[in-house]
Amino acid sequence: MNSNQPLIHLRAIEPEDLDLLYRIENDVKLWNVGITNVPYSRYTLHDYVANASYDIYTDRQVRMMVENDQHEVVGVVDLVSFDPSNRRAEVGLIILNAFRRQGYGSSALESVMEYALNVVHLHQLYAYVDATNEASLRLFQKMNYQPSATIKDWLFDGRKYRDVVLMQRVI
């Protein structure tokens, strides 16, 4: 990890994280940067936390909490759409507003890349980034993701369609 980046560690979701996950999943401002566009109930999230195997081969996804060195949760990182045959997965990242622009996004992407490479033995990570989300595009490029395609009208925000940039990193 780069010495300029804050120290973080990734950990499994705990029942105590349910309130934070509920706020994240139901934040309508985040719906237009991903595929979620409906609210999640506490019951649904509780069921996910209780029943996820945390085995990426079983669930085809894994979600981890991002903690700083003071053990504060600063965000959430996901590997989803796991494809073991082609050794790739989509990465998703949310850094809480209070912790943005402090290097936590870079640290989280670096840590999840190390996990993907050394534990899951993936060959590639990718992300779909809203073409208007300049901060996320800069972050992924800084972390050696390459823009490989622009997908037209991929996201709909309720008023208009927006393009996404497919960002890929071969690891």
Residue ranges and their predicted role:
Residues 39-60, 68:
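Active-site rim helix/loop that mediates acceptor-substrate recognition in acyltransferases
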Residues 1-9, 13-18, 68-171:
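Acyl-donor (CoA/ACP) binding surface of acyl/acetyltransferases
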Residues 1-47:
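A short, well-structured alpha-helix characteristic of acyl/acetyltransferase catalytic modules
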Residues 29-30, 35, 50, 95-96, ...:
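A broad detector of the eukaryotic-type serine/threonine protein kinase catalytic domain
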Residues 32-34, 61, 164:
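Short, hydrophobic secondary-structure boundary micro-motifs
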